């Protein structure tokens, strides 16, 4: 097996309880990287999606966000950080597991006052089961009722408890590695982050999100693939477009996927059929756009598969 890395790519899930500030944080990440216009915001773009679809005929609001990072920790490269939206509680168990299957690391975002809530426990357990590295992000450090050190300790206790529970169930689980968790302190509203713990109720001692980007690039591994392996892509979610019909959201694990390509579609019942990719869409900020091809680690949407469903795979046709 010839292992290779997509060093220009990171796939990460941000796990957070509702109202802990995930949308505001992702908004700030997009703005600071210039991933979309300076005056646009996540919620504004989301509300505009129907108008955008009508205007462009192909733009669909993505289920993931693609941040284009060219900052000082990119070492002269342009790095795409795909942020996958993962439901924050157990009611969406299957969707949580599928979302985590698309990523190589997790940012656990907790409110500096409320701390980790019970709903977070389920998602975090699934992430640890999958041996995904975790970054702890304590958000809203400037809340008047912030209790930063206590919340940090609560999050570490939660991680330790979950990891200890999993030791007997998950083979080769490296508990020490899982618990070696970097901590970032942030205010998504202020667009500020630091590795230094601020005083309760204070902003981080840094005026941008570079420490968060650095933590993601350092601790979330680049997608690994076998450059001699044929196409291998897995459908993890579905979407629809008034113009393209059913869309399959998938991650490419090996090989290359191309618009217009005819591939082997492996159905849930084990049968195979050949089908043609009529459209391939990548994500930029919050919008999907047409692309010609996708490689290992890429998360894309494809059209042309009318009855495709979650869990099915695409591979090369065997002649």
Predicted ranges, named:
Residues 1-317:
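Structural and coupling elements of P-loop NTPases
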